[in-house]
Amino acid sequence: MGLFNFNFGEKPATSEKKAEDFGRNIKATLEFKRHQDPGKDQATGMSADWLTEKGKTASIQDGKAIEENSVKGYASPKKRAQETVDLMLDNVYTSPAYSVDVINKSTASLEGTGAEKLNNNQREENKFNIRTRQELDATANFVKIMPIASAWAEEQLKGGAKLDKYSLIVQWYLDNPEKCKENGVLTGHETAAEIAERVAVELGMTERFYRNSVVRLINVTHGPKIEPFLQELVGFKNLAEIGGALQPGESINFAVRIDANKRKTVKLLFRDKEYPIDEAQIKALAQEYRDRIEGRK
């Protein structure tokens, strides 16, 4: 299914599509989620590219909790992110009285239909039937700064720091853009621009949904990807201000509402708090990402 060809919501009575058929009475949730609990690479301290049983169980439970009429999932190219989405989509609750339209079916649900052959030519890293997005990928070369950030976090803990070690590692990342540049790691601001690109695209997509759509778009990414983006939007200096870094499986959500007159409101929801957002700020950040990608060509 093409990126902009979402047939969510109330379909037009005829095959002729008119402007008034789209972008009215829309309820959409754009979910940006850290993948569920992964294994651990003991040599580097980084996440291994698979989910633990705990992570798999949590993904299944998240899928069962989905209530929107239509849902679609995207993920980082990493398997642990794809598996998180795959398990969610494969466990969306349906019954004769209530049905959720899962736009991209999981690999398991394709077995025996012949459609599973579509996956035979996928690269190994694209193991699941999930649309991957490079903007959601893990921060490249983060392993190069992990020893420095980890050592700093240990020192902070010895000094009585209240945050957990992982949150302190993310805090070091946010506070040291120059060290990141020296090690070939994207800065927090650059990482924020990647997530902004995905958010900007999906905010635009909501305006092209059929009228009366109730949709959830799931985007599974990594730590620390969401925290720098949150810092740009919310303006905190220390992660303690928002309760620490995101834990495995934790999300931020954009609640999008478009009324019958195409007036759109967007709120950022995180840890039982609502934050107003500036779409222009998100678009500007996204443009930085696009300019950076264009500069590589």
Describe the predicted segments one by one.
Residues 157-190:
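Short glycine/proline- and acidic residue-enriched helix-loop micro-motifs
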Residues 217-229:
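Active-site beta-strand/loop microenvironment that shapes enzyme catalytic pockets
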Residues 195-210:
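A short, acidic, amphipathic alpha-helical segment used as a generic capping/interface helix at domain edges
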Residues 4, 8-137, 178-197, 226, ...:
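Active-site-proximal alpha-helix that buttresses catalytic centers in soluble enzyme cores
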